[in-house]
Amino acid sequence: LNQNYLNAVLQGMKSVTSDTGGTAYVRFKDFNISVGGKTGSAEAPNNQVHAWFVGFAPFENPEIAIVVMVENGGHGNYTAEVVRDIMGEYFGMNTQDIEENMGAMIYTETLQ
């Protein structure tokens, strides 16, 4: 892989969380560790949209990478909040118990 291409991708992922126009900027603007990330959505049947976010931190020397996907979750910046909270716990930044801020709902459907 050409290093120039890799650098362009990495800078794009940094701008997602650090530039005011970034799709996850609102979620990471006050986060004390630099994060690279990418929001996304995937169309599903019946006009449903799955949301996802992939992030890694610290940007300069990553220790952790996380992907969160929520079925029928809409757009990816909501999943960025989940990644931010997990990273906050990992780096010892959150003061509240993570269970108070996050929940998981298991949804299953049988296709006929």
Task: Please name every model-derived segment.
Residues 28, 97-112:
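Acidic/histidine-enriched alpha-helical segments
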Residues 4-97:
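Active-site beta-strand/loop architecture of penicillin-binding DD-peptidases
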Residues 1:
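Conserved catalytic neighborhood of penicillin-recognizing serine enzymes
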